[in-house]
């Protein structure tokens, strides 16, 4: 599977190497060195429009959130077919008005992750040729020929081979005419820089999330907490993996340059975003209201947990009151559990009612579709069996009958409103 990912990476690196070595006249080692930066420029330039679209879609989704909340509040408690259809229509109109594209945020990751995997796999195969570095048998890797693989293997930066890594066995380092100390002295600042840049990028991403976080969504709140944890752990990965894992020098260079590009691109795009699409007053008011509600719930939860823990501590300090304190904790837990279950049950009932209404709408739509298909077949059969003396329909009528305007939304998207012909 990873072999497929090698081809685009090796193809881009080969083109940059040919351009820098054959056209610009750079030394072979320098050409391979700068081809890594060329790979970053190429990939980031390709995904830059999608990244901007992701930023823009995120800001648009924030602007539309107060209007969606108002619609949900307006149709709260309405489960009949007419209300659901009207709500769906108004939501679709709102999405069209603001140009919402929920898939825009997926593209950068879908492009960048395979590139990183392909680069890592390609460099690892270069650093570990068949037969070992002592008796290498060079083979084609993606679009790279055996001669180009051998040339890359001989590439050096500050006298450190591009395929070398800190945890590489001593025999292989000796074959590459280097030592672990030389490799460590070169890559350690790179991995530290990569860790710092990663931390800054995560902090900026968290800042954007705090700006527009949907506090009414449990998933959004969970993702925000996950990002907080990852912002602490993410900077550790470059150091730990770089110093203990098989991460060649070339990947360290790619890592630093890619994170630096990400930082500069994020700063530029955030400045443009704030100037062209500033947060609206409606969103700010709605965001503050939702945040206050969320914080009140969190405070209530903390008070509950703190009271229960305090009672447990008092049970140890004052054992003569243990039974009373335990009964208090049991009662507190029962009350809170009952409140949570009641709220869950209410949400579940609402969801079930809407789901049942939606099923009825889907069944009715499918029935109408079958009926229309049967009518069209009957009309076509009547035309074929018609007598030659009978008036035949015009050419336009035949075309219309042979290509009936069946509602496409009924099969693919049965949730939408049926056409006026029904």
From Swiss-Prot:
Keyword annotations: Cell membrane, Chaperone, Membrane, Protein transport, Transmembrane, Transmembrane helix, Transport
InterPro entries, alphabetized: YidC/ALB3/OXA1/COX18, YidC/Oxa/ALB_C, YidC_ALB_C
Biased amino acid composition, Polar residues: 401-413
Record's bilayer topology term: Multi-pass membrane protein
GO CC entries: plasma membrane
BP GO terms, sorted: protein insertion into membrane; protein transport
Region named Disordered: 350-422
Record-annotated membrane-spanning stretches: 30-50, 103-123, 183-203, 226-246, 253-273
Positions with biased composition (Basic and acidic residues): 350-362
Subcellular location per the Swiss-Prot or TrEMBL entry: Cell membrane
GO molecular function, one term: membrane insertase activity
Top-level lineage group: Bacteria
Major location (coarse): membrane
Function comment: Required for the insertion and/or proper folding and/or complex formation of integral membrane proteins into the membrane. Involved in integration of membrane proteins that insert both dependently and independently of the Sec translocase complex, as well as at least some lipoproteins. Aids folding of multispanning membrane proteins.
Similarity field: Belongs to the OXA1/ALB3/YidC family. Type 1 subfamily.
Quaternary structure annotation from Swiss-Prot or TrEMBL: Interacts with the Sec translocase complex via SecD. Specifically interacts with transmembrane segments of nascent integral membrane proteins during membrane integration.
Protein name, as recorded: Membrane protein insertase YidC
Organism whose genome encodes this protein: Corynebacterium glutamicum (strain ATCC 13032 / DSM 20300 / JCM 1318 / BCRC 11384 / CCUG 27702 / LMG 3730 / NBRC 12168 / NCIMB 10025 / NRRL B-2784 / 534)
Gene from which this protein is expressed: yidC
């Amino acid at each position: 599977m990873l072999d497929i990912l090698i081809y685009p990476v090796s193809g881009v690196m080969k083109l940059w190497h040919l351009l820098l070595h054959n056209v610009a006249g750079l030394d072979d080692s320098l050409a391979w060195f700068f081809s890594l930066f060329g790979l970053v420029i190429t990939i980031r330039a390709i995904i830059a429009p999608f990244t901007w679209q992701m930023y823009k879609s995120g800001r648009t989704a924030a602007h539309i959130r107060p209007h969606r909340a108002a619609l949900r509040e307006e149709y709260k408690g309405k489960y009949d077919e007419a209300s659901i259809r009207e709500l769906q229509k108004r939501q679709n109109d709102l999405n069209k008005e603001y140009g919402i594209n929920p898939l825009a945020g997926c593209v950068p990751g879908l492009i960048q992750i395979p590139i990183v995997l392909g680069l890592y796999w390609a460099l690892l195969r270069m650093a570990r040729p068949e037969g070992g570095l002592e008796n290498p048998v060079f083979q084609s890797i993606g679009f790279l020929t055996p001669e180009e693989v051998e040339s890359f293997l001989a590439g050096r930066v500050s006298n450190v081979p591009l395929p070398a890594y800190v945890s590489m066995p001593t025999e292989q380092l000796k074959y590459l005419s280097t030592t672990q100390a030389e490799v460590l002295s070169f890559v350690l600042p790179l991995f530290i820089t990569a860790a710092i840049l990663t931390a800054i990028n995560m902090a900026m991403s968290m800042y954007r999330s705090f700006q527009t976080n949907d506090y009414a969504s449990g998933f959004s709140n969970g993702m925000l907490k996950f990002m907080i944890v990852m912002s602490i752990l993410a900077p550790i990965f470059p150091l730990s993996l770089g110093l203990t894992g098989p991460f060649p020098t070339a990947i360290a260079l790619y890592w630093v340059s890619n994170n630096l590009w990400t930082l500069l691109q994020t700063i530029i795009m955030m400045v443009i975003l704030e100037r062209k699409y500033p947060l609206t007053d409606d969103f700010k008011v709605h965001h503050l209201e939702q945040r206050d509600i969320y914080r009140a719930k969190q405070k209530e939860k903390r008070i509950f947990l703190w009271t229960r823990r305090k009672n447990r501590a008092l049970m140890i300090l004052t054992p003569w009151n243990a039974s009373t304190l335990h009964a208090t904790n049991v009662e507190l837990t029962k009350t809170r559990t009952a409140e949570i279950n009641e709220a869950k049950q209410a949400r579940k009932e609402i969801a079930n009612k809407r789901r049942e209404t939606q099923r009825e709408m889907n069944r009715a739509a499918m029935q109408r579709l079958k009926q229309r298909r049967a009518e069209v077949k009957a009309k076509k059969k009547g035309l074929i069996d018609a007598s030659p003396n009978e008036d035949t329909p015009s050419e336009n009528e035949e075309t219309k009958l042979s290509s009936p305007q069946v509602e496409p939304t009924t099969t693919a998207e049965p949730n939408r409103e049926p056409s006026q012909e029904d």
